[in-house]
Design a protein with these regions (language model features):
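P-loop NTPase motor domains
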Residues: 1-171, 187, 228, 232, ...
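H-loop/switch region of ABC-family ATPase nucleotide-binding domains
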Residues: 177
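Aromatic-lined carbohydrate-recognition surfaces of secreted/lumenal glycan-active proteins
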Residues: 180
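C-terminal regions of RecA-like/P-loop NTPase motor modules
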Residues: 183-289
Length: 289
C-alpha cells in the first residue's frame, strides 16, 4: 500500500515520468525496502530485536542512493536530489508524529514551492490513520481539492477513492474548491463528477456566471437557482441534498466568527477585546453580523 502512495508522490514530483521510469522506480522501491530487511511479507515489518516495534523505515535518501546506481534512473535521482540534499530536504526524515496526541497540526504553510507534494503527503498520512479503526467516527476535510484533483489520473483516483470508501471506515469526507474549472479539468471532468456523485450534500456559495453554468449542468439546477448563485452575498448559499435544493443564509455566532475570521477589521477588534477581557473576550457579544 505504501508503494502505491509513493508512485503517486512521484507522479506529482515528476509530471512527465515515463512508463519505463515508473517500472524502474517500482523496482527501486522494492530494493530500498529490502535493504532495510522489509519484503512483501508483513511479518518482515516487525523488529525481532525489539518486540512490538516496527523496523526503521527507509527515507527518500535511501531511495536516492538506489536510483543513483543505474544510468536509466539517474534522471529521477537528480530530480529527487532537491528533496534529499537541497532546499526541500525536510522531506528526507523519518515521520516523528505522535499519533496518540489529541490534536495534530500538519503545517505545510512554508512549503509553497512543493505544495502539491506536501498536501498529498499530509493527506496520505491522515487517510492511513482514518482506516486504522472502523469503530471510530472521523471526517477528512480537503481544502482546495482541485489542486490534487487536476494533477494527474493517479492522484485524482486517489482522491475519488477516499470519497467512495470512507463511509466503510466509519467516516465522512468533505472537499472545498474555489476553482471549478480545474476541479472538472481532468479527463473531461471524470474525477470531479465522481467526487460529486459520491457526495450526498453540496453547498454552493457565490460563483461567477461561467462557473455557475457548470454547477447548473452537473447538479441539474433551474435557471432561477443558477441566477441566484451569481448574486449571493456573503453568508448566502444553495444546499443541494437528496435531489432537493434550498437557498439558505448562514449566520455565525460571535464565537464562531472570532475563531474563523480573516478580516483585518474583525481581527483588530478581537485583539482589542482580548487585551481588555482576556480569554473571556470570546464570550462578549451575540450573533455576528
Amino acid at each position: 500500500m505504501k508503494i502505491q502512495s509513493l508512485h503517486i508522490f512521484f507522479t506529482i514530483l515528476i509530471p512527465d515520468i515515463t512508463h519505463e521510469e515508473r517500472q524502474l522506480l517500482d523496482e527501486a522501491f522494492i530494493i530500498t525496502y529490502q535493504k532495510k530487511g522489509i519484503t512483501h511479507d508483513n511479518v518482515s515489518l516487525w523488529d525481532q530485536d525489539h518486540p512490538g516495534k516496527y523496523k526503521e523505515m527507509p527515507i527518500l535518501g535511501d531511495l536516492y542512493q538506489v536510483l543513483l546506481e543505474k544510468e536509466e534512473t539517474r534522471r529521477m535521482a537528480n530530480i529527487l536530489n532537491r528533496l534529499v540534499n537541497g532546499s526541500s530536504s525536510n522531506f528526507n526524515h523519518q515521520t516523528n508524529i505522535d499519533s496518540d496526541n489529541k490534536y495534530m497540526i500538519l503545517d505545510i504553510s512554508e512549503m509553497q514551492s512543493d505544495l502539491g507534494l506536501a498536501t498529498f503527503t499530509a493527506l496520505d498520512f491522515v487517510w492511513s490513520k482514518a482506516k486504522e479503526d472502523r469503530t471510530k467516527e472521523k471526517a477528512i476535510f480537503i481544502d482546495e481539492c482541485w489542486a490534487l484533483l487536476s494533477t494527474n489520473e493517479l492522484t485524482a483516483n486517489y482522491i475519488l477513492e477516499i470519497f467512495k470508501t470512507i463511509r466503510g471506515y466509519g467516516g465522512a469526507a468533505v472537499c472545498a474548491s474555489q476553482d471549478l474549472e480545474d476541479f472538472f479539468s481532468l479527463k473531461g471532468g471524470k474525477y470531479g463528477k465522481g467526487v460529486l456523485n459520491n457526495t450526498k450534500t453540496k453547498i454552493i456559495l457565490n460563483l461567477e456566471h461561467k462557473e455557475a453554468e457548470v454547477v447548473k449542468k452537473e447538479l441539474d439546477l433551474s435557471e432561477a437557482e443558477m441566477l441566484a448563485i451569481t448574486r449571493f452575498e456573503r453568508g448566502n448559499a444553495l444546499i443541494s441534498t437528496n435531489n432537493n435544493n434550498l437557498l439558505v443564509e448562514f449566520k455565525a455566532s460571535r464565537l464562531e466568527k472570532d475563531l474563523i475570521t480573516t478580516d483585518r477589521k474583525d481581527l483588530k477588534e478581537l485583539k482589542e477585546r482580548l487585551e481588555k477581557y482576556g480569554e473571556t473576550a470570546y464570550e462578549k457579544g451575540g450573533m455576528a453580523k
